[in-house]
Every structure is written in C-alpha cells, then in structure tokens.
C-alpha cells in the first residue's frame, strides 16, 4: 500500500534527506555490503570451523527501515511506514503489521519496488522485525478520516494539522484525491467581495451554502445526517451551484456523481465524516438506488456485514450532510415518499434570476476557494455556547411552525441551517439577512413539495385515478358500471371511495393514511365513529371512505355529472 500525500509524511521527509540505511543500527548477524552496483543486505551465518570466514547469504538490495509506527486513535490498529532506497531514490510504503510479519504478505510488495523473492522473503521478514527492535520507530497517532474523531477535529488541511498531536493518514488513492481537493486559493476578503456578494440575496443558493458549511456542526448539535438538494428543469444552474458551494472547502474535485455503488457512498460518507458530501445529478443512476442510498446515508451508519471469519465487521459511522442535484426531487423518486421527505430538504424555486452573470461568478470562485470553511469553524468555536442556545430556540420555532409531521421532523434540520446562517453572518464581510433566507426557503418547500403532506398527496393520487376511471363510479347522476368493478359511489355531499379501492392503492399504509385523513377532517365518518361509512346504492349496501365535497373542491376535483345533458346532477 502506498502512503498518501497527507501531513503525516512531514516527519518522514526529514528522514528521507539522510541515507537511513547507513544511519540505523544493523542488528547482530547482518551486514551491509557496498559494491559498484549499490548496496546489499546479507545475513551472516557463523562458520562451524575455526579459521573459516562466516557465510554470507544475500537478502535484498533495497534495505528496509521501519521509520514510523502509526496507531489509529479509533481502531487502535497499528501500521507502519517502511522506507527503502531504489536506485538512490527514497520510497515510502505504508504497510500493515501483517505485511511485515508474514513472508507471503511481504512478497506482494515486490510490485512496490521492494527487492524480495519467494526464497528471500522469510529472511527479510526476520530482518525487518529485528531491525525494528534495534531501531524503534517514531510513534505517531493518526486518524484515518476527517472531522470529529475521538475528541479531536481532524482537518484535511496540512497547514492546520501541522501542530496537532494527531496526524491525518490515508493510504487509499480515492480518499487521497479528496484530501488533495481540500485546498485554498485567494483570500477570505476576496471570496467575500467576489463570490458571496453576488449570491447573498439568492435564497436557494444560500441554503445550499449553509448546508455545505453547516455539515461540520451535526455532531455539535446531535443531529442525524440529512440531505439538502436543489432540483428542477435543466439549465437552471444546479451543477453550477454545487460547484459554487463546494468552494467553501476547496475545489470542485470534491464533487462526485450519483453513478456510484452503495459501498462507495458508505465509505466516502464515513471518511468525510463531518464534512459535506457532494453528489451531482440523480439521473446518473436508478431512482430506486437514490432512495435506498438516501435511507442508508441518513441512518448515519453502514449496514451490518459479515466477514470471512463469520463475525460482523465494525460499522462505519458518519454525521454530515449530503448535498445533491437532480431534475426530479429525491422524494418524488421514492415509493415510501413520506419516509424520504423527512430526510430531505428540497429546494425547487429558480436559484438565479434571468440574465444572471454566471461567467464572472464562475471565474471568481475558481480563483477564491477553501477559505470560508476554516473561517466558519473558527467563528463557531469563538461563541459556541451562544450558537447552541440559538439552535435550541430555532428548533422550538420550527417545531411550532411545522404544519405537518414531515415539516416538524425537518425542524431540526432547518434549525441547524438557520444557526449556520447566523454564524456566517457574524464573520466580517459576510453580513446578510439569514432569517429572510431561511424563511423563504422554508415557505418555498412547503408550497412546492407535495410529498411533504403524504396523506393529502396519496388522496390526490387516488382521486386522479378515479377521475380517469369514471366508468367505474356509480351514484347520483351516474349510470351503472358495465365493465369491471365499482370503485366509488358519488353523492351530492361526498364521494365514497370503496374500501377495496383504497386498500388496493394504500396497501400496508391503509390504517396510517386513513387515520390521517380523519385527523385532517377529510372524512364523513360512519356509525359509532367508524372511519368507513355505509352507503346504499340501488338496494345494495357498500362500505368506503366518504371524502367531503368541500375537500374535493379544495383539491380541484369535481365528480358531479352535471356535464351530462341527461343528468339532474
């Protein structure tokens, strides 16, 4: 495994400047031999006869030294940095304890330039461990992921972590690419004047910016992960916005597409941990995958999986925000719409005004990035108790404001976004009306997102189905059903949707949804306060859910047959 370009290598670079193979103490029974082609490590086998020289057995021409011992502060697992020289060029490899203890594992490092064969691997393992005892490696505490880890906050920025007792360590090339994308250019003042000033009055864009910044606060306020998405038709600036809001932490290389596997999303969420995950364009994968990934991500932990030892792997955990784009909202992709809706803040209004200058703003945030995120964390730390009290106040406000169960469950998410806006507003040069921003975004979501009120949405869907199948309706003004079953009975004061029709549409959610219909006052109930009403038609008694006429009108439906010239209705 190759070490990543993380800050832990700072200490290694000091050793790289020296010929460590000559500096270290060579264990008894070994020697380093210099020759015209380089150097060689030999094992010395004492002669059995007096006067005969000791026998030399060649081991390797790339003499390894274990320079660092890395101890993961979460798992307590130990790994090492192995240093050797290949044609006078230093090579650092991150190796597990198993790889330097098992000759078969060590042999795999031949692909990393280590001079080892099947006949020398056992001897080389013995030398490495003997050398490690003679030359104890430097102990380094490391974290293998970002954000809140065991009482530390692990930054992806090398300059911030240089004085920390814990170093960031990654030997995964994919994660290393993410680490490299967390970098800065320009100044905070430049970002304020050239980027923030252009977007501070755009509610949809600002809420996405709040989500990007506020992700690092989820553990601070005890929130589960959630999703913030901007959805709508093409060419409205969705991907542009994602690039923009990622700039508070680094470059647009932080963004990946939805064309991923469940495992890769879990791994990335766990690695980023507290920092936001950016996913572009839900069209890149199947809707069922998106909804499944949404449920899994918002749980904050990976699925339980067994291993070859028939035990369970340790679960990966995270507390961050997933920021997404797509033409269709994630909630609309789901069969269980209410469950998804309570996990997703959906922004559907036009994010930018007509004739907006995208070109200038694009140039600005590509020349100024990676500064605001650090300033945000610093500002939060300076008044942490004040912001925590503000969060509690905002949470109470949104709980009271929530007009239904979904918006009440999203109240904590909006409270976090609101306090994020407050922290941002307290940074010099980033003053703006954060209350107005959140208020507009909240009201927009209530207005545009029909999946928020699931009972109402499902009733609308059933009514649309009946409207398209009026030949299966009987009652006042209707003729008899000639083909198929009766699905509803129309009366002047209500439309009675037969129980079987509702059961067919609502399946296992029948009791929950019809109970909500009752609470909302949609139903004319039957005898003994039963939800289903008995309705008589042509001497036959039917049972069903009687939807009030005023509710039908409110939802835009007219099931009267007044358009029929032969009808009195």
Regions found by a protein language model. Name each.
Residues 2-199, 267-268, 272-275:
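Conserved glycine-centered beta->alpha loop in an early N-terminal alpha/beta scaffold
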Residues 140-198, 386-569:
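DNA transaction DNA-binding modules
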Residues 241-290:
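AAA+/P-loop NTPase substrate/partner-engagement loops
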Residues 281, 319-329, 348-350:
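A short beta-strand-to-loop transition that corresponds to the Sensor-1 phosphate-sensing loop
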Residues 291-305:
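Conserved catalytic/switch belt of AAA+ P-loop NTPases
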Residues 307-324, 340:
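AAA+/SF3 P-loop NTPase mechanochemical coupling elements
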Residues 316-318, 334-427:
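Phosphate-sensing "switch" segment of ASCE/P-loop ATPases
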